[in-house]
């Protein structure tokens, strides 16, 4: 399974690069199912779907939100998920994803897909933050005591993901989480996608920014590297 974490504010150019990468991976253009649980207002659904419908030919939005009744049974929901290659969590507040998705049948379905080679799951902004073993719910980089952590969806093994990384100066926040919780971290800039295998192996960086990797070793030491689209390392 591929796991795709995007740092937010995705441009059409980067979205098209992602489509091309996935098309090569699947040997055809994949179908996309958007889960907009994180958004604050269901009125945003049409805008979210409209953006991605300009990128992929087959795009569906599943109106799973605490303010909306989707009227789908567990069986209907499972059948719908089976029909799509790429499940994608849009942005907003990651707490909503954790509360509505973690432990839900959708979550179980995605975990079962972990060993499937021809499947992808991803998210942008809050959707990316929810993908790892841990999820940063909130917290200021200037006040570490304000940082709130919970279990993530566990789709990207061994990682905690932070987003809008360079733009919101979240270096200190992520380093604090990595050292305190003894986990690897990746911070992803806006308009940047990091593509992994579900076991944490990095495959590709796409977009205009960097993905910043903070590796925690068993001796409590922290290693840092950062990568751009060309996969160059500094």
What are these regions (language model features)?
Residues 1-28, 39-46, 137-234:
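C-terminal and late-domain segments of enzyme folds
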Residues 96-100, 107-168:
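Class I SAM-dependent methyltransferase SAM-binding "motif I" and its flanking Rossmann-like core
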Residues 76-78, 84-86, 94-118, 226-234:
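Mature, structured domains of secreted/extracytosolic soluble proteins
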Residues 32, 87, 125, 161, ...:
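A residue-level signal for conserved active-site and pocket-lining positions in enzyme catalytic cores
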Residues 1-86, 90:
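N-terminal beta1-alpha1 cap of cysteine-dependent amidohydrolase-like domains
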Residues 9, 92-94, 127:
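Short glycine-rich anion-binding loops that position phosphate/pyrophosphate groups of nucleotides
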Residues 45, 71-74, 97-101, 133:
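Short, conserved acidic/polar surface loops in the N-terminal third of protein domains
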């Amino acid at each position: 399974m591929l796991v795709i974490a995007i740092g937010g504010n995705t441009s059409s150019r980067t979205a098209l690069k992602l489509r091309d990468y996935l098309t090569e991976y699947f040997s055809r253009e994949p179908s996309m199912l958007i889960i907009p649980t994180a958004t604050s207002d269901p009125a945003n659904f049409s805008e979210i779907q409209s953006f991605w419908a300009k990128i992929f030919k087959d795009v569906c939005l599943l109106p799973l939100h605490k303010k909306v009744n989707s009227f789908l049974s567990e069986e209907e929901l499972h059948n719908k998920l089976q029909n799509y290659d790429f499940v994608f969590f849009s942005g907003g507040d990651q707490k909503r994803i954790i509360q509505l998705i973690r432990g839900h049948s959708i979550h179980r379905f995605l975990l079962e897909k972990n060993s499937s080679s021809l499947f992808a799951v991803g998210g942008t902004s809050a959707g990316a933050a929810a993908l790892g073993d841990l999820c940063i719910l909130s917290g200021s980089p200037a006040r570490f005591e304000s940082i709130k952590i919970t279990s993530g969806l566990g789709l990207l093994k061994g990682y905690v993901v932070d987003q809008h990384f360079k733009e919101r100066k979240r270096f200190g926040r992520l380093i604090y989480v990595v050292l305190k919780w003894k986990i690897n971290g990746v911070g992803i800039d806006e308009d940047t996608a990091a593509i992994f295998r579900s076991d944490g192996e990095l495959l590709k960086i796409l977009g205009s920014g960097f993905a910043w990797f903070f590796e925690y070793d068993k001796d409590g030491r922290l290693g840092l590297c950062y990568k751009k689209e060309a996969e160059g390392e500094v």
